[in-house]
Swiss-Prot record:
Keywords: Allosteric enzyme, Glycosyltransferase, GTP-binding, Magnesium, Nucleotide-binding, Transferase. The gene is upp. Catalyzes the conversion of uracil and 5-phospho-alpha-D-ribose 1-diphosphate (PRPP) to UMP and diphosphate. Signal peptide: none annotated. NCBIfam families: PRK00129.1 (NF001097), upp (TIGR01091). This is Uracil phosphoribosyltransferase.
């Protein structure tokens, strides 16, 4: 299986088309990021291992399938990544939530890390690292660096975004060829300011109504 996947589910593509529109309000944008995050989680979790468990229904005892004991952590890259968390938690409410805080230096376009707060047992968890955008790839690379420094296993890390630029995908794959990348759309390119084209604008500003 390829370590890069564009999730082409019709509901995801439909909601993404509405999310991209410049006239979408902050409320609409926030709700759509939440919904797409939930749908992406459904697709990304397809390969979670199952185990047989014996239960008792009102009629009789039986053997059923349930997700095996592996624990999950959702780790948003702040601030925009926080918009995807609630949608995923609706599907996987027992997941722990960590945070990696970064901002982009507007002159160098390089990410600056200011916060890392993770579950103590992050090394034993499956990790959904989430950020709506994969632009230059700098923030994602630094975030994966931070996870690996804290003994997270590469095979347990899945980077999940809504829109990606080819440049960002290439950079992340070159820096961390051992993690999986999922996106709802692979866009055309980055512009001279480091923004994805056609993209959806600044996801953080659109989520929180800031400039």
């Amino acid at each position: 299986m390829s370590k890069f996947q564009v999730v082409e589910h019709p509901l995801i593509q439909h909601k993404l088309s509405i999310l991209r529109r410049k006239e979408a309000s902050t409320k609409e944008f926030r709700e759509l990021v939440d919904e797409i995050g939930m749908l992406m989680a459904y697709e990304v979790s397809r390969d979670l291992p199952l185990e047989d468990v014996e239960i008792e229904t009102p009629v009789q005892k039986t053997t059923v399938k349930q997700i095996a004991g592996k624990k999950l952590a959702i780790v948003p890259i702040l601030r925009a990544g926080i918009g995807m968390v609630d949608g995923i938690l609706k599907l996987i409410p027992a997941a722990r939530v960590g945070h990696i805080g970064m901002y982009r230096d507007e002159e160098t376009l390089k990410p600056v890390e200011y916060l890392v707060k993770l579950p103590a047992d992050i090394a034993d968890r499956q990790i959904f690292l989430v950020d709506p955008m994969l632009a230059t790839g700098g923030s994602a690379i630094l975030a994966v660096d931070s996870l690996k420094k804290r003994n997270a296993k590469a095979e347990n890390i899945k980077f999940v975004c809504l829109v990606a630029a080819p440049e960002g995908v290439k950079a992340l794959q070159e820096a961390h060829p051992d993690i999986e990348i999922y996106t709802a759309a692979l866009d055309e390119k980055l512009n001279e300011h480091g923004y994805i084209v056609p993209g959806l604008g600044d996801a953080g500003d659109r989520l929180f109504g800031t400039k």
